[in-house]
């Protein structure tokens, strides 16, 4: 089958792009052609369609629901693609339930969680760092931080429930909550192998 991956950056490791790259790799291993033809059999549009070349399946990992934003305006292009799509692939049951509450149910939909290549992960060495190695347990969280990702809640939970010799490592851009604490470390953006090494 010829499949066009729409609105995806195979060079990015953000959530939808990372999922798309892994999915494309698996589909190619199974004999499908990805983004190589001008006349695809099907188009997989990530979040919203940039164009329409074939029947559309939408890959959706969430919709906007932050009441402090104009969520209806932000959801407009996502909703347009949802209405256009012949089917929808949701990232999670939560996402499916939330989307169907606001957009209505789709006749053809499925939940496919973000998978990963366990063989690839097994080849990544564990993080070995003299500062981190002195702790009994390493807690971690990573995101492209935005208010609804609740970084402050992550830190609060860690401080309330961690042991005295545990640390928290926070990875990702734009942390919207920062605290100076001898067991909390901000490491910025990490690439995929670095994140796996940390975990």
Specify the residue positions occupied by each region the protein language model found.
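N-terminal pre-catalytic "stem/leader" segment of glycosyltransferase-like enzymes
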Residues: 1-42
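Short donor-sugar binding/catalytic loops of nucleotide-sugar-dependent glycosyltransferases
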Residues: 9, 142-147, 174, 190
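Active-site proximal beta-strand in glycosyltransferases
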Residues: 42-68
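Membrane-proximal helix-turn-helix segments that form the acceptor-binding/catalytic region
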Residues: 71-88
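Short alpha-helical donor nucleotide-sugar binding micro-motif in glycosyltransferases
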Residues: 82, 197-199
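Carbohydrate-associated surface elements
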Residues: 94, 115
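Conserved donor-binding/catalytic core segment of Leloir-type glycosyltransferases
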Residues: 128-149, 155-161, 168-169
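Nucleotide-activated donor-binding/catalytic signature segment of Leloir-type glycosyltransferases, i.e.
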Residues: 172-196
């Amino acid at each position: 089958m010829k499949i066009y991956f729409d609105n995806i950056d195979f060079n990015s490791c953000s959530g939808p792009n990372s999922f798309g790259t892994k999915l494309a790799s698996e589909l190619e291993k199974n004999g499908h052609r990805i983004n190589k033809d001008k006349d695809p059999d099907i188009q997989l549009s990530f979040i919203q369609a940039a164009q329409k070349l074939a029947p559309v399946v939408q890959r959706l990992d969430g919709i906007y629901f932050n009441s402090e934003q104009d969520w209806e305006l932000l959801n407009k292009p996502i909703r347009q693609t949802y209405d256009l799509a012949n089917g929808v692939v949701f990232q999670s049951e939560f996402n499916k339930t939330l989307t169907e509450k606001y957009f209505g149910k789709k006749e053809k939909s499925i939940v496919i969680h973000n998978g990963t290549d366990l063989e690839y992960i097994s080849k990544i060495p564990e993080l070995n760092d003299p500062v981190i190695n002195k702790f009994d347990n390493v807690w971690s969280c990573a995101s492209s931080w935005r208010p609804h990702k609740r970084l402050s809640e992550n830190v609060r939970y860690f401080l309330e429930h961690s042991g005295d010799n545990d640390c928290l490592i926070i990875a990702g851009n734009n942390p919207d909550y920062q605290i100076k604490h001898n067991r909390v470390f901000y490491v910025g953006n990490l690439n995929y192998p670095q994140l796996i090494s940390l975990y």
